[in-house]
């Protein structure tokens, strides 16, 4: 279980929670602008002309590369986070993500560099994945290891707020340039602006994080001589079942979010015929439910427990799977918005307590590594595969099967969460 800390003073607490939230906001902004561009822009700019569906799948494949890279980032940054400290590691992770994102904004396209452009895009995407792989676990520990007793769920949800904030800002960035630029300007140079704008955001994030001090739990662990030589080996050697169950217990959180985000954007604009700007506005408004449900879930987690909150959210997600065909099969604005709001809202309900719940699975000397690996392995299973699988199922078998896919993932997560109870103790 997490160590109990004395409550930090109000000013220090605000600084800690702001740093954990701002950092993840920037990281997820960088991550999501790629996701949006992978559906709307990159198929035309970085891949050969031909079948638009094939180009979109190729673009989504580069999107999925980051999820493969994220466990690598988790292992690298987790190692140093558990050995030299949370603060320095978080600063480095933010810089890795920021540099990779800025480089995407400077890349040549297929028209000028051919297949080399797609390879460079993939390389930058891997860099994004490595950076985010090291970011999330450290941000969660920055918050939870500073939390007073009985407040781990509340503190742990602050870095989670970075996901909806980053999503809304990224969608807003693409909406802004779409409204201000012609289609020719957007595909010529306008798409680069959201990536290059990350320079300012990263500078702000670095300034805030450099003001931090190390967490009390890490200081105690080092003072007691608990530093381990290879945290990665300890996690796999001593806690493989916790890693396995934690991964499966987190997977559906990713599946439901990326179905409501990436899959829905592609299907809504390409198959249902919604204009790009209209659908982005609907997603941005629906994403507010994502942000609203995170603090609700965090507060409830402190009352009933993080695992119990995750079980409730998972049961609701399983039920939501059966609403795919009724709500998302026609050009009905009201039905589609309800679908998006439910999808994003349930994402927040499960995502809010996830950080504090996963942090309880591992002791302080390997907590950064264990928590990061668990989260990012779940990303591979849930996020990287969700949009391609859903696109294939919807195209060949219909939307109902996309819902069945979500419900099946939810059932597997539910079983894992039931068994996690024994491991948590």
Predicted regions and their residues:
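Helix-to-loop junctions at the C-terminal end of transmembrane segments
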Residues: 74-86, 294-306
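Extracytoplasmic gate region of multi-pass secondary transporters
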Residues: 35-36, 240-289, 383
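C-terminal transmembrane helical hairpin of 12-TM major facilitator-type secondary transporters
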Residues: 307-353
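Glycine-rich segments within core transmembrane alpha-helices of 12-TM secondary carriers
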Residues: 154-178, 375-386
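Cytoplasmic membrane-interface "Motif A"-like loop-to-helix N-cap segments
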Residues: 83-95, 303-314
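C-terminal ends and interior cores of transmembrane alpha-helices
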Residues: 95-113, 315-330
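A late C-terminal transmembrane helix in Major Facilitator Superfamily
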Residues: 365-394
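Multi-pass alpha-helical transporter architecture, strongest
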Residues: 205-212, 408-425
């Amino acid at each position: 279980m997490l160590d109990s800390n004395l409550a930090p003073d109000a000013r220090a607490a605000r600084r800690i929670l702001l740093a954990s939230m701002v950092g993840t906001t920037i990281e997820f902004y960088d991550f999501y602008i790629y996701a949006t561009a992978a559906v709307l822009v990159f198929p035309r700019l970085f891949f050969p002309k031909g079948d638009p569906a094939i180009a979109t799948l190729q673009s989504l494949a580069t999107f999925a590369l980051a999820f493969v890279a994220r466990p690598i980032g988790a292992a690298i940054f987790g190692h140093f986070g558990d050995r030299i400290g949370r603060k320095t590691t978080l600063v480095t992770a933010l810089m890795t993500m920021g540099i990779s994102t800025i480089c995407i904004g400077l890349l040549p396209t297929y028209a000028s560099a051919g297949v080399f452009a797609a390879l460079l895009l993939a390389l930058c995407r891997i860099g994004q994945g490595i950076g985010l792989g090291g970011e999330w676990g450290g941000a969660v520990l920055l918050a939870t290891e500073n939390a007073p007793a009985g407040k781990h769920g509340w503190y742990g949800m602050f870095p989670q707020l970075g996901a909806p904030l980053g999503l809304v800002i990224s969608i807003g960035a693409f909406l802004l340039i779409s409204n201000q630029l012609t289609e020719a300007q957007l595909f010529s140079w306008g798409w680069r602006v959201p990536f290059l704008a990350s320079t300012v955001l990263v500078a702000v994030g670095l300034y805030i994080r450099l003001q931090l001090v190390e967490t009390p739990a890490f200081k105690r662990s080092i003072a007691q001589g608990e530093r381990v030589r290879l945290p990665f080996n300890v996690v796999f050697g001593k806690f493989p079942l916790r890693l396995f169950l934690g991964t499966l217990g987190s997977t559906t959180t990713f599946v439901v979010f990326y179905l409501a985000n990436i899959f829905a954007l592609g299907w809504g604009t390409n198959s249902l015929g919604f204009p790009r700007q209209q659908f982005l506005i609907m997603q941005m408004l629906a994403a507010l439910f994502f942000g609203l449900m995170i603090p609700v879930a965090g507060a409830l987690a402190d009352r009933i427990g993080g695992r119990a909150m995750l079980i409730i959210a998972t049961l609701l997600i399983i039920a939501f799977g059966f609403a795919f065909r009724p709500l998302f099969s026609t050009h009905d604005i009201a039905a589609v918005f309800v679908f998006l709001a439910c999808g994003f809202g349930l994402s927040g309900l499960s995502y809010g307590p996830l950080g504090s719940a996963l942090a309880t699975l591992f002791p302080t000397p390997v907590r950064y590594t264990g928590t990061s690996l668990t989260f990012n392995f779940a990303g591979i299973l849930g996020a990287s595969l969700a949009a391609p699988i859903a696109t294939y199922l919807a195209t060949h078998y219909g939307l109902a099967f996309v819902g069945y896919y979500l419900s099946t993932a939810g059932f597997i997560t539910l079983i894992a969460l039931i068994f996690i109870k024994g491991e948590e103790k």
